[in-house]
Structure formats: C-alpha cells, structure tokens
C-alpha cells in the first residue's frame, strides 16, 4: 500500500472530511482517529460501503495512556474478507471512559467490549449485556489500568494485596540478578 492512495482510503477520507484523522499506515494497515460520537457511523460506513466491505471485526482493545490526557483509547481492528484489507480505528476517550457500542454493526463486538469494560472500565453505551467477562462480579477495580496496584487490592481472596512494600526486584541494568544453584 505504497505510492498512490488506494481507492478505499480516498472513499474514507472523502466521506468523513475533517472528522476522521488519517494516522497513516504501518505494515500495510491504515489507521484512523475517530471521535467517540462518530464511531458507530464510521464503523457502519466501513462495513456497508460496497467498495470497502470491512465485514470482520478482529478485535477491540482498550489502552491506558496514563498519565497522558485523554487517558483512555479504544482500538478497533477490522478486516475486509473480500478485499483482503486491514484497517485500525483509534478512538480517544476522556474520563470516565465511555463510547457508544458497535454491537449493532458487528455482533462479535459484544465479547470484545465486555473485555475492555472488565479490564479497563471503558463503558460501552447501549451495550446489550455489559458485565464482567473474566473477573468475578463484585471485583473492585480494573486490572489492566496502569494505576491498578501490581499486587492487587487486599481482600479475603488476596490477603497479601496492596499493603506493604513490593517484593524486591533484580536490577537488570547492573546485572544484579540473584544466582540460583543446586
């Protein structure tokens, strides 16, 4: 995807003008930044446009950019089975992080969005069943956030949680690695 701009990229930029920011391409995957309020419309356009047909939602990832602002981001990876094209959509979110659900565009978004909710606390507005998928109901916090305690929170299931100093770590920069032996 070098040289002349591909037809599908021209269609994307032409249809959304200044609302969609072209982030360029890496490894043949074009990336776009889309405001949260336009994510559903943009995704539906990518799926339904006859020249594009991004019919496969590979995944949705949550990203925590702490301490940057905006802190959170959702990243959508799409694939067109017909055209064999990939595209990445990035959506920066304020706090508390929330974005409309794309389950009305791709049903598989259901599980991907539940995972981003469970790990990062990103709320997908309009999701049909937004509940934890890995952690148990009643779990406090979101374990993939950068401010989540590395040892977890202290509770009955984790009596050695956040209180107390962290375990000592070897200093890899000085090769101060403890030597095991027999």
From Swiss-Prot:
Q: Tell me which UniProt keywords the record has, alphabetically.
A: Cell inner membrane, Cell membrane, Membrane, NAD, Plasmid, Quinone, Translocase, Transport, Ubiquinone
Q: Which Gene Ontology molecular function entries are recorded, alphabetically?
A: NADH dehydrogenase (ubiquinone) activity; NADH:ubiquinone reductase (non-electrogenic) activity; quinone binding
PROSITE patterns, sorted: COMPLEX1_30K (PS00542)
Q: Which InterPro entries match?
A: NADH_DH_suC, NADH_quin_OxRdtase_su_C/D-like, NADH_UbQ_OxRdtase_30kDa_su, NADH_UbQ_OxRdtase_CS
Bilayer topology annotation: Peripheral membrane protein
The UniProt family comment states: Belongs to the complex I 30 kDa subunit family.
Which protein, by its recorded name, is this? NADH-quinone oxidoreductase subunit C 2
Source organism (scientific name): Rhizobium meliloti (strain 1021)
Alphabetized HAMAP family for the sequence = NDH1_NuoC (MF_01357)
Coiled-coil spans in chain: none
């Amino acid at each position: 995807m070098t040289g002349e701009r591909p037809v599908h990229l021209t269609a994307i930029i032409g249809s959304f003008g200044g609302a969609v920011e072209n982030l360029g391409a890496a490894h043949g995957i074009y990336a776009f930044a889309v405001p949260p309020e336009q994510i559903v419309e943009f995704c539906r356009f990518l799926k339904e446009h006859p020249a594009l047909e991004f019919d496969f939602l590979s995944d949705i990832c949550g990203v925590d950019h702490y301490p940057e602002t905006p802190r959170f981001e959702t990243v959508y990876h799409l694939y067109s089975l017909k055209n064999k094209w990939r595209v990445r959509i990035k959506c920066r979110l304020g706090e508390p992080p929330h974005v409309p659900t794309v389950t009305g565009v791709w049903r598989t978004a259901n599980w991907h969005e539940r995972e981003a909710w469970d790990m990062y606390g990103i709320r997908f507005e309009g999701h049909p069943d937004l509940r934890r998928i890995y952690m148990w109901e009643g779990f406090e916090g979101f374990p993939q956030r950068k401010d989540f305690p590395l040892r977890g929170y202290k509770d009955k299931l984790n009596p050695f949680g956040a209180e107390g100093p962290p375990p000592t770590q070897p200093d890899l920069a000085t090769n101060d690695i403890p030597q095991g032996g027999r």
